[in-house]
Amino acid sequence: MKYKDLRDFVGRLETIGELRRISQNVSPVLEMTELCDRVLRAGGPALLFESKAQHEFPVLGNLFGTPRRVALGMGVDAQAGEGDGAALESLRDVGRLLSALKEPEPPKGLKDAGKLFSLAKAVWDMAPKTVSAPPCQEIVWEGNDVDLARLPIQTCWPGDAGPLITWGLTVTKGPNKSRQNLGIYRQQLIGRNKLIMRWLAHRGGALDFREFALQNPGKPYPVAVVLGADPATILGAVTPVPDTLSEYQFAGLLRGGRTELAKCITPGVDGLQVPARAEIVLEGFIYPQEGAPSPAPAGAPPRPVKGASAAYEHALEGPYGDHTGYYNEQEWFPVFTVERITMRRDAIYHSTYTGKPPDEPAVLGVALNEVFVPLLQKQFSEITDFYLPPEGCSYRMAIVQMKKSYPGHAKRVMFGVWSFLRQFMYTKFIVVVDEDVNIRDWKEVIWAITTRIDPARDTVLVDRTPIDYLDFASPVAGLGSKMGLDATNKWPGETDREWGRPIVMDDAVKQRIDTLWNELGL
């Protein structure tokens, strides 16, 4: 189903009972987090906080708090009563689409050639279009009117350093690429018009910024942040879209209609384009540092001094409660100065929180897991299922089900998964099992681990590999080890012993008891 903007999606959710309006006064300082957390854990609806007692904008929370709403946002109209299972299964179709776009198979005949041409035409037809007089610029704040404190920016946890923008869709462009990058990076409020842009070094926005700083030393770097885009664009920014396809094009494919864009209006930022029907847009720059920077506080990490980007204004970010369930360390990141804020009339502020799973990122991880499966199966046909348990903080542990064909096969699959998608670069643990193990049932996975693994033979340790920057368990920030567990049945060459045969009841006996079951009244 097509959703032209966030309001359209909110209306649809309300119609099908997936959104609740909250008229009571709920503070964006801690209270919204507690309420959204309880509702998410209960599998409840999205929440629209409408009270203006403390702020002038309604706040939308828990938007993607169930896999069904993620599927709806991706254009899959999961029916009421089907549950999250049906929604997750439908998301594999999105994965098959991505798989075809990433590595299209050569046509086997005229019919296949026609399908390939139709897919290519669909992608071409989804090229975004620029519109004039966009709704996202109905209201413009400039000069001293630019005051981020007027937005209901959440403070999520008691130990947080301050208010935090959590669902900002950051738009950047590097000097060496024709396409824009869309990324979701948290942003700490530190002043009337200043935010800390927390993008990690490997993320697209940080790469664009470094390349710009190298080629344009001393020049301000333009940035736009979108708050409240349509669901297809938001989800396109967190999906492994092929490098040859822009997130705006992919959003158009999901939506079934071209993405309408608007040029930013701030001089110097007008080279960036944002969704024309976005609720709120922040426009501005990362400026070069003026004068000597103040010294780092006692006990804080040193300021960045290497690289062209170090010459730009930076500030100490955090600590903040994160998706790991812990407060992260403080670190230096660039400062984004907001020069203009544009918005729609009666704009909606879209927000979330992150914390110990389950949270909204964990739910997104469960949903995107289904998108990953066809991508992996296209590359590794022996993989029969794949699961990222939400308790593993979205991606830190993966369970792989496979059809094993030779000794050492499971280890090949481990290294294949680690190297296939950027998303799996930070997966610390991979457990590989056979087809007879339900990888979504921890009881079965633990049974396979404890009965099919010899720790010395079946454990793979890889040291000094890229690790999530937030993983404080690693000995060095961003660098740590990985573990693979081969919980498959062992083949000749992997063991000299007679391997155990699983106990299975005779089918005829099971059928006989099936017929007696109702009579027995058990």
Swiss-Prot record:
Q: What class of enzyme is it?
A: lyase
A Gene Ontology biological process annotation? Answer: ubiquinone biosynthetic process
Pathway annotation from the record: Cofactor biosynthesis; ubiquinone biosynthesis
Query: Which gene specifies this protein's sequence?
Result: ubiD
Got a GO cellular component term for this one? Answer: plasma membrane
Q: One Pfam family name from the record?
A: UbiD
PANTHER family per the record? 3-OCTAPRENYL-4-HYDROXYBENZOATE CARBOXY-LYASE-RELATED, FERULIC ACID DECARBOXYLASE 1
**Residues the entry annotates as binding prenylated FMN:** 184-186, 198-200, 203-204
The primary site where this protein sits is: membrane
The identity of this protein, by name, is 3-octaprenyl-4-hydroxybenzoate carboxy-lyase
Subunit composition? Homohexamer.
Sequence similarity = Belongs to the UbiD family.
Q: Which organism is it from?
A: Paraburkholderia phytofirmans (strain DSM 17436 / LMG 22146 / PsJN) (Burkholderia phytofirmans)
| Residues annotated as catalytic | 322 (proton donor)
One of the record's GO molecular function terms: metal ion binding
